[in-house]
Amino acid sequence: DSLKKLRTDHFDLYQLHGLTTMDDLEKAAGPDGALETFVKAREAGKIRHVGFSAHSAEVALAAMDRFDFDSILFPFNFVCWHEAQFGPQVLAKAKEKNVARLALKAMAYSPWPENASHEPYGKCWYQPTSQSQLASKALRFTLSLDITAAIPPGEEALFDMALDIAENFQPLSPEELEGVKKLAQGVKPIFRLSA
C-alpha cells in the first residue's frame, strides 16, 4: 500500500528505527522480527538497502555484528564525541564493515536545562547549537568525519542554517578541530556510553 501511495515499486532504503536497547535489537533481529520481514522484502525487490538507526553505541555495535546492514543513522556530534567518547567506535565499525554512515544530531549541544523554555526550538528535545558560529563548527565537525551524509535538524530555522553551512562547507582545520574539542569541554552530552 505504501509503495502505491508513493507511486514506486521499491524503497531505496528501509531502516529499523530507534534501536535503543539490546531488547529492541533482539526483538527486531530475532525469529519473526522486523528484520526478517525486511530481508524478505529485499529478496522480493521491494527494498534495495536495509539500514537502522540507534541512539546507543553498544546497540549499534551489536547490530552491525549481527547483520550486514547497508546503512546506519547515528548521532555523530562534537559534544558526545569529545565529552563522552560516544561515536568514534561506531564510526570505526561502520567503516570497517563498509556500512554507509548517516549522521544526525550534528547541531545538538546539550540537554535543555531543567525548566528552560524550548522556544523558539519547540521541536528539539535537546538544546541546539543555535548561535551561527557554534552551529557552523558543530556541523562542520560532523561533516569532517568520514560520513556519507548528515541529516539536517527538523526545526525549520536550524534546517535552513544547516543548509547554508553545508553549501559553504569547508572541513575543519587541525586548529579548528582543537578549538571544537575545547568548546565541548564541560558540556553535558545528550548521549553517553552505557555504564
Describe the role of every protein-language-model region.
Residues D1-L3, T37:
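Short, well-ordered amphipathic alpha-helical segments that serve as non-catalytic structural scaffolds
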Residues L3-E26:
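Active-site groove signature of glycoside hydrolases
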Residues L19-A195:
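Beta/alpha (TIM)-barrel catalytic core signal, keyed to glycine-rich beta->alpha loops juxtaposed to Asp/Glu
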